[in-house]
A protein has these predicted regions:
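TPR/TPR-like (Sel1-like) alpha-helical repeat modules
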Residues: 68-87, 99
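Structural marker of alpha-solenoid helical repeat scaffolds
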Residues: 13, 47, 64, 81-85
């Protein structure tokens, strides 16, 4: 919980920092708190849809909890954003995850 507390403290002064929000969501996943991680990822992607890495992690979280249809949509949105940003590796990872769920 120490890392979570540190990240929360940093977010108090930098509430719009996408990196900190993403890092906090990952810490919640490590602690087994998928619900809190999901809220953070969803908020982050609403406010900063270009933060490409969060799509993959949110998609994997959704897969883990059995929300496959939403995971597919998240991967699709992430692939669009990755293409816009020219992030081919991120695009490929999300495409692979999407294909695994689709077929």
């Amino acid at each position: 919980m120490e890392r979570i507390d540190k990240l929360k403290g940093m977010l108090e002064t930098n509430s719009g920092d996408s990196f900190l929000q993403h890092a906090l969501a990952l810490e919640y996943i490590k602690q087994g708190d998928d619900a809190e991680a999901r809220k953070l990822f969803e908020h982050l992607l609403q406010t900063n849809p270009g933060y490409v890495g969060s799509y993959y992690h949110l998609g994997k979280l959704l897969e883990r909890i059995g929300d496959i249809n939403t995971a597919l949509k998240i991967y699709e949105n992430g692939m669009k954003e990755a293409q816009k940003a020219g992030e081919q590796q991120a695009y490929g990872e999300m495409r692979g995850a999407w294909e695994e769920l689709s077929f």
